[in-house]
Regions:
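Conserved nucleotide-sugar donor-binding catalytic segment
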Residues: 129-217
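A conserved acidic beta->alpha catalytic loop
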Residues: 22, 37-47
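C-terminal subregions of glycosyltransferases and related glycan-biosynthesis enzymes
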Residues: 186, 201-293
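Glycine-rich, basic loop-to-helix element that forms the pyrophosphate-binding segment
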Residues: 65-81
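Conserved donor NDP-sugar-binding/catalytic core segment of glycosyltransferases
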Residues: 98-136
Length: 293
């Protein structure tokens, strides 16, 4: 099987029928749909079960787990996946009807690329709003890792990364006791140290940002998961390929969220040279507290 289309969900039963109908329209059929229910209290299980009685037949595999956050659901789904490629499809988003076919064709072309440097770990395409407007400013058609995408080619906004399943098994999200959020960029940056992506200039993912979602409350979410936030920014200060100004911003954000630590929060160190970022980090933290109080 080529694809695992993976949907993490938490109390989004009302959105799943639309997502199912969109998947039924895919022109490429060599995929399974893996749904990991992150401890929902609504009727998600019954909704998913109703799909199995309908005509559109592709494998639907449903798993329920204790609530731990999206990143833990991804780890769970990766372990259950049967597909060679792993595509994360959030419950409020959708794929254009030819999306999987485009990705499959691009993936076939990977075999003809010369083997030099890092291995290719997946495919990366454009995200767009439902009106067709591309999100951010992607400007590359070729091969690059996630760090090069942002800091050499100047790509902004979300992209749709479709990784080899074995790559995500090699680089799981850290699961920190008491925290329910981990930035995807932490793992994408780790993957970039070993693997590149085949980028192609096609819209393969349509995204909505729902009110009350993770994106809408990202500062508060990061404050509630300070260890994962610190880990992300601390590692960014040490990554080759990230320019000094970006590493300085990362150091400022490290201190910004370190000040949210609880006694039980694991310690995440940062180099002594970044003590200079403490004061601006403190000011940002105080502003966060004032704004969110």
């Amino acid at each position: 099987m080529l694809f695992t289309v993976f949907t993490p969900t938490f109390n989004r039963a009302a959105l799943l029928p639309r997502l199912y109908e969109r998947l039924c329209r895919q022109t490429f059929r060599d995929f399974e749909w893996v749904i990991v229910d992150d401890g929902s209290t609504d009727n998600t299980a019954a909704v998913v079960d109703s799909f199995r009685d309908k005509e559109c037949k592709f494998p639907i595999r449903y798993f329920n787990k204790e609530n731990g956050g999206k990143h833990t659901a991804i780890n769970y789904g990766v372990q259950k996946a049967s597909g060679e490629l792993f595509l994360i499809l959030d419950s409020d988003d959708e794929l254009p009807m030819d999306s999987l076919n485009k990705i499959a064709e691009a993936w076939q072309s990977v075999a003809s690329l010369p083997a030099k440097g890092k291995q290719i770990g997946g495919i990366c395409g454009y995200m767009a709003h439902r009106d067709g407007t591309v999100i951010g400013h992607p400007t590359i058609n070729g091969v690059a890792d996630s760090i090069e995408l942002r800091y050499i080619y100047g790509v902004t906004g979300d992209m749709c990364e479709v990784f080899r399943t074995m790559v995500l098994r090699e680089f799981p999200f850290p699961e920190i006791q008491g925290e329910k959020f981990c930035p995807e960029v932490l793992v994408w940056n780790r993957i970039a140290t070993k693997y590149t992506l085949k980028i192609f200039p096609e819209i393969i993912y349509l995204r909505d940002y729902l009110q009350g979602g993770l994106t809408d409350n990202i500062t508060l979410v990061r404050m509630r998961s300070p260890a994962a936030s610190m880990m992300t920014y601390s590692e960014m200060t040490r990554l080759a390929g990230i320019p000094f100004r970006a590493r300085l911003r990362a150091a400022i954000n490290y201190w910004r969220f370190r000040l949210c630590r609880r006694p039980s929060t694991p310690r995440v160190p940062i180099g002594h040279r970044w003590m200079c970022a403490f004061l601006p980090g403190l000011l940002l933290h105080l502003n966060d507290v004032r704004t969110l109080s």
